[in-house]
C-alpha cells in the first residue's frame, strides 16, 4: 500500500523534542509577551498537540498580526507556483519564539539615533548609511634581502641517458 499523506506524515524527527529538553514545558513559555508587528520563529513543540501548525511552517519566520489569549496570529510567506503568498495562521504560544532576525537592525537604529543627537548638538549633518569595507592600507616589508633566481638549463640528451 502507498504511504499516507496525513497532516503529521514524515515528522518523526522534525517534531521530536531535543536531547535533555523532554518533559514539562517551562512556565516562561507562557509568560512571554507578544505584540503585533513582532517577528517570531515558528518552532513546533511536539509535546503539545493543540494549536500545532502544519509541518510546512516549522522553522519559518513570520510577523504577528493578531494576539489572542492563548495563541498568536502569524503572517508567513509561502511560495505557491511562481508567486509568494502571505499566509495567516493561528499558532499557540508554545509553538512560537521571539525571532532574532531584526536584532541587528534595532541595535543599529539605536546607535544611529545617538549619532544623530550628537551631530544635532554640534550643528552638523551626518550620513548614517553603511559603507562597504574598503581595501586594506598598504605597507612596506622590512628586513628582506632580494635574491635573483635563474632557471637551470634543461639538458634533454643527459636526461634521456639517465633513464627514469
UniProtKB/Swiss-Prot annotation:
Q: Does the keyword Transmembrane apply?
A: no
Gene Ontology annotations for the cellular component aspect, listed alphabetically: cytosolic large ribosomal subunit; nucleus
**GO terms for MF:** structural constituent of ribosome
Its GO biological process annotations read: translation
**Pfam families, alphabetically?**
Ribosomal_L21e
Instruction: List the keywords (alphabetical).
Output: Ribonucleoprotein, Ribosomal protein
Record-linked InterPro entries: Ribosomal_eL21, Ribosomal_eL21_CS, Ribosomal_eL21_sf, Translation_prot_SH3-like_sf
Family assignment from sequence similarity: Belongs to the eukaryotic ribosomal protein eL21 family.
This chain belongs to which protein, by name? Answer: Large ribosomal subunit protein eL21x/eL21w
Q: Which organism's genome codes for this protein?
A: Arabidopsis thaliana
Q: Which gene encodes it?
A: RPL21E
